[in-house]
């Protein structure tokens, strides 16, 4: 276990920093930067590990916002040596995929643009339009993010007309098929009329359409149709003929961009300002534009000249190699173009060319993509300007010495003291940073059904949130040295950073109890505090018994209201979830012989009590820790 000193950033411990740097070899490989909780926050590669890692700690890098932000959190550096640079690139790609380090995730999780998800983690995969990746579903495959959601929905609609697909997450009926099966829209997934292996074969065909391999799929289907005809399986042959007809209709809906149907290429271009970068990627397959993808990157987190290379590494490392095109056109030169080309070629199994065209039709195509990126950046900048104005007005309203980049909001939720929980929501640069949100289960045993105490709950909440910083201060650490004054919306959630402002949902009483908690931690002078009462939307600050005066349309007040409402929503949602889970478990605990561990296993396996009630005996028996005898016992209980 590390000591408190070992948890300090290396830049604050010169002796440990020198020892760390001296032990890094002058060889190709990957380096892993970790924070004080052993979380990997950055993975890099280099042909000379020693030289590359040392470069982060040179004075001239102080002007690099991304590096200065990251180095405030690096407490440990590990390394892995490889034989050459290409091997280091492959290793880096695999490590990033498995660890998802914060500072390697260049592309923002922008929920404005949807993905198409194929749930390969399930026995019978579904095809969904989603705006965030599913948890605990590593085998799922994502395509996107797509700019044109209407076109995406139309594509999915046409695909479902060509191939019968699973329509529901759970069965509608327990012992009979639904209307979707009767009209041929579903192959009978719920009742397992089609086997998992046969259904997954259908999904693989659908995936070929999404990947732009429609011509290849047509050839496979034509060959299969001829085989069925020879074997006199005319009904099966007719099904394939109808699918081919549907594919021809689908192909006609795609925009032709190149007269040559053999052209498979991606065109990538970008536009940047000081805070954000917009990247557009056009996918052209068989001479047709099959998709227009859009990404947003944080300009602070990488050098603008390297941004396209980072996009290529991050985007293509997540793809099925068969999707990688033969040619990639860029708007800018990248540093390691030969190594990247070799890496992509090795992944694909055939040559991948990367070009930066200056004249000809290819250059015109790159210019078109760049115009789209510039338009998207303009839209993005307007949102940033609005958020900055709100922060400036809030700083003036609360008499803060600087704009509050990171603001935390806290709220409590319970019903007469039962299932009491707390929420922490975080706004960075005026925008929700949802991966920083935290949920708290109130542990004080005096708070229970019939005895609620919001003040005691807030006191516990604030104490638990800031106790680590109190320990640092007791140790003599200068908090201003490790405080993150350049908070970014993409800061890692493991960064226990001081907020520039803390807002409590409530009035003077709630504010005073939060202040007492900070005084107990010796942090009341370090953290700015306010509260926002629902009645009259009054703002209170320490040392002032009367609410601050401001207009109802003040941008600073509107920002605090959004934060307050979000903290309330997050707390109430968590409380309802805990209460519902308690009710679920109460129903299951009525079954004799079922303990807490088996209840948890059943709920994790089926997701709901309703699904358990509808399950067959053999399905219940497939849950972890549940055998045939217990499964029959459970089934009999629900089917008396």
From Swiss-Prot:
GO terms for molecular function: DNA binding; excinuclease ABC activity. It is found in: Cytoplasm. GO terms for cellular component: cytoplasm; excinuclease repair complex. InterPro entries: GIY-YIG_endonuc, GIY-YIG_endonuc_sf, GIY-YIG_UvrC_Cho, Hlx-hairpin-Hlx_DNA-bd_motif, RuvA_2-like, UVR_dom, UVR_dom_sf, UvrABC_protein_C. It holds the Pfam family UvrC_RNaseH. Signal peptide: none annotated. Residues 215-250 form the UVR domain. Its main location: cytoplasm. Keywords: Cytoplasm, DNA damage, DNA excision, DNA repair, Excision nuclease, SOS response. Belongs to the UvrC family. The UvrABC repair system catalyzes the recognition and processing of DNA lesions. UvrC both incises the 5' and 3' sides of the lesion. The N-terminal half is responsible for the 3' incision and the C-terminal half is responsible for the 5' incision. PANTHER family: UVRABC SYSTEM PROTEIN C, UVRC/OXIDOREDUCTASE. HAMAP family: UvrC. Interacts with UvrB in an incision complex. This is UvrABC system protein C. It comes from Prochlorococcus marinus (strain SARG / CCMP1375 / SS120). The lineage of its organism: Bacteria, Bacillati, Cyanobacteriota, Cyanophyceae, Synechococcales.
